[in-house]
């Protein structure tokens, strides 16, 4: 299954790179996700099979941070590839790079990974797959697209329908298990606090992690005008901190501290998030990558410390025959949590921008008047021109596509007063700063929720759990 997933993911990456239309790219990305979902659970399951009980804590502890490091390091690599524009490929290179990586994974799997088979023949739960897939789509699509579509009524109908479908999924899986058939998700897992608590923690934790990454990238690239490479390098201290946190956790802290390490790591993450928010608020438009190091470094350290024991604690509380099912559910919740975080923080971020822009224009009325006076705009025309500037900036930040010029800005583009461009850029940067700070505050609350939910997990990850 791992090899099938790797082959499919690599082929889908090739299709993404060769896409000739947005529709093809979207379809190829969906295929990527499908085969990626085949790979990830196998990794967790094979760890349980390949390592002895005494070694599993460190093995599980390596899995989460490696995934998180990929999420943090990915933007750095992507920014470098886009800026370098190798062979004139532009953004396509971020998909072409998956070809050698995928080939390496496939060869490595055949060479180093043993083949494990169940002692009894298993039948794929096709109906369960369909129900889970439909339920996931009904929840994820409106969460991701709701803001762009201005939250029409049918979006909330889809969300409600998604919950109903997942309810039917649970009933179906329970009945299938009672009939002695193989369920997609073992119902007995939901009776174990380690598993249900892990799902809740993962939802909040990865929602904050992935959502914050998106918001911060938008602020750096769109708000401050950083290039993709510069934006990626700006987050390098976070990646370094994460490696340091992972190394510290792997030195024996996971075995000695268990849940306490996850709690401590989450606290360090919260400190880092607060530090980044304060830095952004104080530095404003003068922000440089150097300013962010004191906040991003502990943010990364906390990520490493928290993620290292996460999978170990959760999976140590399930039986051997439940590992595959639990692994699949955990990785699914990780993706669902990421989508929820993107939807929530994205809605907050973009929802605040238009109002923040108009507020800053109103607060800077004296400065705008000085710009008009210097440009020789007659006093009688200044209120109308100021209103037009206000409308233009409001519509510009509310536009989904930053390359599209709103109709309200077309009348100004040809005869803009001198100094107005600088004024407008300053207002937009201030609005992005305010939206980023508030969104980081929401992410802080999500991390606080993950901290509280972590008390549902076992106190320690016993290496002999399930044996």
Positions of PLM-derived features:
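Helix-loop-helix hairpins in multi-pass membrane proteins, especially solute transporters
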Residues: 1-127
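Interfacial helix-cap and linker-helix signal at transmembrane-aqueous boundaries
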Residues: 77-87, 143, 220-221, 252-254, ...
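Transmembrane-helix exit segments and adjacent C-terminal regions of multi-pass membrane proteins
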Residues: 175, 312, 372-467
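Transmembrane-helix signature of multi-pass solute transporters
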Residues: 8-19, 31, 35, 101-108, ...
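Hydrophobic transmembrane-helix bundles of small-molecule transporters
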Residues: 83-200, 208, 226-227, 234
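Transmembrane core module of solute transporters
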Residues: 157, 165, 174-322, 444, ...
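Residue-level signature of the transmembrane alpha-helical cores
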Residues: 2-8, 12, 28, 35, ...
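Small-residue-rich alpha-helical segments with characteristic i,i+4
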Residues: 40, 45, 57-73, 235, ...
């Amino acid at each position: 299954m791992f090899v099938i997933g790797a082959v499919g993911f690599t082929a889908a990456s090739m299709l993404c790179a060769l896409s000739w239309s947005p529709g093809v790219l979207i379809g190829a990305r969906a295929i990527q996700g499908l085969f990626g979902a085949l790979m990830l659970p196998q990794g967790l399951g094979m760890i349980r099979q390949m390592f002895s009980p005494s070694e599993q804590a460190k093995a599980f502890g390596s899995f989460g941070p490696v995934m998180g490091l990929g999420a943090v390091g990915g933007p750095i690599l992507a920014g470098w590839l886009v800026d370098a524009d190798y062979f004139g490929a532009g953004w396509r290179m971020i998909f072409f790079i998956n070809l050698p990586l995928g080939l390496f994974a496939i060869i490595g799997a055949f060479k180093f990974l043993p083949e494990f088979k169940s002692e009894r023949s298993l039948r794929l739960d096709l109906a369960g797959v369909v129900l889970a897939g439909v339920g996931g789509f009904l929840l994820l699509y409106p969460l991701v697209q709701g803001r762009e579509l201005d939250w029409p009524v049918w979006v909330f109908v889809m969300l409600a329908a998604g919950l109903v479908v997942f309810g039917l999924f649970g009933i179906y899986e329970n009945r299938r298990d009672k009939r002695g058939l193989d369920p997609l998700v073992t119902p007995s897992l939901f009776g174990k606090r380690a598993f249900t608590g892990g799902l809740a923690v993962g939802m909040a934790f990865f929602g904050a992690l992935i959502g914050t990454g998106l918001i911060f990238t938008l602020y750096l690239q769109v708000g401050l005008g950083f290039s993709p490479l510069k934006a990626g390098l700006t987050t390098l201290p976070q990646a370094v901190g994460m490696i340091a946190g992972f190394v510290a956790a792997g030195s024996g802290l996971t075995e000695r501290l268990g849940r306490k390490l996850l709690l401590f790591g989450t606290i360090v993450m919260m400190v880092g998030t607060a530090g980044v928010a304060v830095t952004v608020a104080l530095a404003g438009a003068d922000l440089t990558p150097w300013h962010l190091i004191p906040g991003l470094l502990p943010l990364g350290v906390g990520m490493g410390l928290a993620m290292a024991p996460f999978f170990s604690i959760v999976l140590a509380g399930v039986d051997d025959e439940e590992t595959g099912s639990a692994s699949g559910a955990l990785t699914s919740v990780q993706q669902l949590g990421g989508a929820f975080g993107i939807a929530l923080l994205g809605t907050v971020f973009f929802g605040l921008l238009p109002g923040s822009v108009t507020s800053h224009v109103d607060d800077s009325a004296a400065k705008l008047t000085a710009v008009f006076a210097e440009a020789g705009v007659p006093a009688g025309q200044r209120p109308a021109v100021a209103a037009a500037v206000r409308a233009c900036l409001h519509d510009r930040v509310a536009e989904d596509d930053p390359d599209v010029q709103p109709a309200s800005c077309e009348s100004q583009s040809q005869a803009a007063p001198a100094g107005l461009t600088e004024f407008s850029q300053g207002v937009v940067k201030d609005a992005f700063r305010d939206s980023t700070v508030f969104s980081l505050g929401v992410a802080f609350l999500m991390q606080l929720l993950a901290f509280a939910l972590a008390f549902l997990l076992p106190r320690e990850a016993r290496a002999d759990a399930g044996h």
